């Protein structure tokens, strides 16, 4: 089943990042842009400075799970969002990550 909420193409990432609307906190940088759909589309980027591939994939899985679990709260936001992960994510627990990410996404509204 194809997930229509995920941004995967490089040109889509570049288009949103070049739009230059950002919001930041200690563990995430979020680039965003309006879209014409009635739902949130997201892309996740974890740089190579953050651990090895196993650690990076774990962080991406956690972020995807946070977004899935909170889809009722954030699902109605009509934005394209790129989530860049900072190194401080490695020191935090899942609950803290969840609160931090959801708070940032709600601020975009």
From Swiss-Prot:
Question: Which class of enzymes does this protein belong to?
Answer: hydrolase
Q: Which Gene3D superfamilies match?
A: 3.30.230.10
Carries keyword Transmembrane helix?
no
Q: Which GO terms describe its cellular component?
A: ribonuclease P complex
Q: GO MF terms on file?
A: 3'-tRNA processing endoribonuclease activity; ribonuclease P activity; tRNA binding
PROSITE patterns, sorted:
RIBONUCLEASE_P
Tell me which EC number(s) this protein carries. 3.1.26.5
**Keywords from the named record:** Endonuclease, Hydrolase, Nuclease, RNA-binding, tRNA processing
Q: Which reaction does it catalyse?
A: Endonucleolytic cleavage of RNA, removing 5'-extranucleotides from tRNA precursor
Q: Note whether Methyltransferase occurs among the keywords.
A: no
Q: Name one GO biological process term.
A: tRNA 5'-leader removal
Record InterPro entries: Ribosomal_Su5_D2-typ_SF, Ribsml_uS5_D2-typ_fold_subgr, RNase_P, RNase_P_CS
Which one Pfam family would you cite for this protein? Ribonuclease_P
The job of this chain, per UniProt, is described as: RNaseP catalyzes the removal of the 5'-leader sequence from pre-tRNA to produce the mature 5'-terminus. It can also cleave other RNA substrates such as 4.5S RNA. The protein component plays an auxiliary but essential role in vivo by binding to the 5'-leader sequence and broadening the substrate specificity of the ribozyme.
Q: Which NCBIfam families match?
A: rnpA
Subunit structure comment from the entry: Consists of a catalytic RNA component (M1 or rnpB) and a protein subunit.
Q: Which family does it belong to?
A: Belongs to the RnpA family.
* Stated name of the protein: Ribonuclease P protein component
Q: Organism, per UniProt?
A: Mycoplasma mycoides subsp. mycoides SC (strain CCUG 32753 / NCTC 10114 / PG1)
State the encoding gene: rnpA
């Amino acid at each position: 089943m194809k997930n229509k909420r995920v941004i995967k193409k490089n040109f889509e990432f570049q288009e949103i990042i070049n739009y230059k609307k950002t919001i930041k906190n200690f563990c995430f940088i979020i680039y965003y842009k309006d879209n014409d759909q009635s739902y949130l589309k997201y892309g996740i980027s974890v740089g190579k400075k953050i651990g090895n591939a196993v650690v990076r994939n774990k962080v991406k899985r956690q972020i995807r799970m946070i977004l899935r679990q909170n889809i009722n709260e954030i699902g109605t936001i009509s934005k394209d969002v790129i989530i860049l992960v900072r190194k401080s994510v490695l020191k935090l627990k899942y609950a803290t990550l969840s609160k931090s990410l959801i708070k940032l996404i709600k601020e975009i509204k």
